[in-house]
Amino acid sequence: AGMDWQELYSFASKQALLGLCFEGIERLGKEYPEELRRNPIGRELLMTWMGKAQQIRRQNMKVNAVASKLFAMLREDGMRCCILKGQGNALMYPNPYSRTPGDIDIWVEGEDKRVISFVRSISPHEKACYHHIEFPSYKGVEVEVHYRPSFLLCSWHDRKLQKYYERVKEQQFSHRVMLGEQ
């Protein structure tokens, strides 16, 4: 039985995996072209998928640029920080530009009150919760500024997790990577 490419596209779209799956299709075409000849993707679907993959690539370039700019801005204001989750995780992909980007999560060193005050000095009405505060959308990219990278609902486990973050923060705040082609 052949691959139902439309079904794969629908699944990949729902799971935010269009870019990654398109990378696989490109590899399939290079490494096993006879498979694609036996079970071809329709031209219209292929063009749609290719277009989505390019949109994902461009969005990654934009989010990388915003993350780098935000990181530099916070450092200039004397705040140590690191990018969490999304764009940092993308570096683990064979092609970081194939991951569908979302918002930027950035961990800023310091007490929650200090970080909240800093963000509210820029945008007074931002909402804060236990582990992060919203930051004004920057060039169309949503940003969350974390004073705690994450949390657990069980207070005993959460205390242990926060102690762990305290132990590793020096390593995290001093780690540098390149996002994109900067």
Language-model features, listed with the residues they occupy:
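Conserved NTP-donor binding/palm subdomain of two-metal-ion nucleotidyltransferases/polymerases, i.e.
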Residues: 1-102, 107-182
